[in-house]
Amino acid sequence: MENYNLIIVGAGPAGLAAAISAKSRGMDRILVIERMEAPGGIPLQCLHTGFGKRRYGVELKGTVYADRLLGEVSKEIELWTNAFVLAVSRDGTVTVSGTGGMCKCSARAVILATGCRERPIGSLPVYGTRPSGIFTAGSVQRMINLNGYRVGSRVVVLGSGDVGMIVSHHLSEHGAQVLAVLEKEQKLGGLVRNRHRYLDPHAIPVILGSTVTQVYGERRLEAVQVCPVDKKGKPIPASGYRLACDTLVTSVGLIPELELMEDLGAELCRQNTDVRTSLPWLFVCGNARRVHSLVDTVEQDGVQASIAACEYLSGIIGG
């Protein structure tokens, strides 16, 4: 079993920033484990700008930012891809399933930079069948930007956060008609500047105080039921209407990936800015700790976690 001083789970912006920072502080025997085929995280599927302003002094496309950040990773840092961490034990043993099978390695300290996952439509009170044509915003980004697929023709987007607006732009650029962006709240979920940048050029309307309550269709989505909501956020069925579409894209929130920490019985520290957990050798950063709006703060979180981990390791190693 290979032994490491520091194992970082996740090679997105937080994990890579943590690895770079730890190495710059003299830490050796660092392993970064990434479940995807390539390191870089979500920015790899983002062709829009807005990444790296704090680190590089200029706003970059997500793909360019990911390449630059990866270029800072020392060759002395071990990086595994296509490797899924199944478990972390209380003795620091990390169980990994990869292309070569299953293996175990040990760490004196572990940083979880596992990111977050999208909330699926199954978590929403939406009735009806589950035909094809229903996607999360992140999956649409991957299909359009990485695979070059055309996702749909007549699209409804549920959720007016920044990701929902950016995906609406990508869909329009690739020939789809985005009929509307629906928002359950009475105000825009994302930045107003992103509405001007991504929605207004395509004349995409935002319908506030409305949600989807039902989907229609057998093999392919045919329509959605749009309902306004009352002051408590409950749909008003009598005021609803059916909107014909072949695609529904949901952008309704993100859930931090904390299962590895929870399986250990560990907890996050109560202070919102603290990357430590109830286990002294375990740290959590980036979107796994809390969902961030900017990659700059995700990076900062990774650096903070590396500092905390190095301080802990200096105490037990005597460095």
PLM features: what roles do these ranges have?
Residues 1-319:
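Residues forming the flavin
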